[in-house]
Amino acid sequence: MLLIPAIDLKDGHCVRLKQGDMDQSTIFSEDPAAMARNWVDKGARRLHLVDLNGAFAGKPKNEAAIKRILAEVGSEIDVQLGGGIRDLDTIERYLDAGLRYVIIGTAAVKNPGFLQDACTAFGGHIIVGLDAKDGRVATDGWSKLTGHEVVDLAKKFQDYGVESIIYTDIGRDGMLSGINIQATVKLAQALTIPVIASGGLSNMADIDALCAVEDEGVQGVICGRSIYSGDLDFEAAQERADELNG
């Protein structure tokens, strides 16, 4: 089970938002590369970066900070990035800089042809991030709810050749209310590619619950607010996950 620390970037800083609200952000570090080093030193095997400004602007906005993170830890662990990735040139630039995976969210839903092209050009490097509320997919930094069912869309993207799906329950993100295990497992069971859980991880009980469903296709979990607030000790959580699932 991969426990994947999130580094959310806003104006070059590492922050956390409350339910995707750019006006409700808490700065946790003004040096994201040092934060990346911190998580790697505590046993992280992958990092999850989000360009928050980019997600809202539709183009990269924190590229300098991202490249500093890649220079610091990119040769040691896999790094994945989402937010503002809307064209193949951006993907190529980030992969050349040392990124392992690019996460396509809104653009995959709105422009499936772009996702197909990305999977063809950069097979093995494309992850789709699906954000959902009550089983329906949301786009544009969670501001718009679509009519798409998560499972149906994920199956289509699986056929395109995406590497995995990051599933975020946006009713829970940043609220420390527990991962929506049921919805995550339902999605994982419908697919043959891995699912990474996101949104609401709060304590060791969540780690235990996720490890219990790893065999259903749940590969890992994004760790956000809980590891920054101290509600969850990342190092201890990763050790527990390794003990449970080896």
Swiss-Prot record:
Superkingdom of origin:
Bacteria
List its EC numbers: 5.3.1.16
InterPro entries cross-referenced by the UniProt entry: Aldolase_TIM, His_biosynth, HisA_bact_arch, Isoase_HisA-like, Isoase_HisA-like_bact, RibuloseP-bd_barrel
> Which catalysed reactions does the entry list for this protein?
1-(5-phospho-beta-D-ribosyl)-5-[(5-phospho-beta-D-ribosylamino)methylideneamino]imidazole-4-carboxamide = 5-[(5-phospho-1-deoxy-D-ribulos-1-ylimino)methylamino]-1-(5-phospho-beta-D-ribosyl)imidazole-4-carboxamide
Enumerate the UniProt keywords alphabetically: Amino-acid biosynthesis, Cytoplasm, Histidine biosynthesis, Isomerase
Tagged with keyword Mitochondrion: no
Which Gene Ontology terms of cellular component type are present?
cytoplasm
For this UniProt entry, what is the primary localization, expressed as one broad class? cytoplasm
UniProt cross-references to Pfam families, sorted A to Z: His_biosynth
CDD domains according to UniProt? HisA
Localization in the cell: Cytoplasm
Positions annotated as active site in the UniProt record: 8, 131
Gene Ontology MF term list: 1-(5-phosphoribosyl)-5-[(5-phosphoribosylamino)methylideneamino]imidazole-4-carboxamide isomerase activity
Q: In which pathway does it act?
A: Amino-acid biosynthesis; L-histidine biosynthesis; L-histidine from 5-phospho-alpha-D-ribose 1-diphosphate: step 4/9
A biological process (GO) of this protein is: L-tryptophan biosynthetic process
Family, similarity comment: Belongs to the HisA/HisF family.
Question: What name goes with this protein?
Answer: 1-(5-phosphoribosyl)-5-[(5-phosphoribosylamino)methylideneamino] imidazole-4-carboxamide isomerase
Give the gene name: hisA
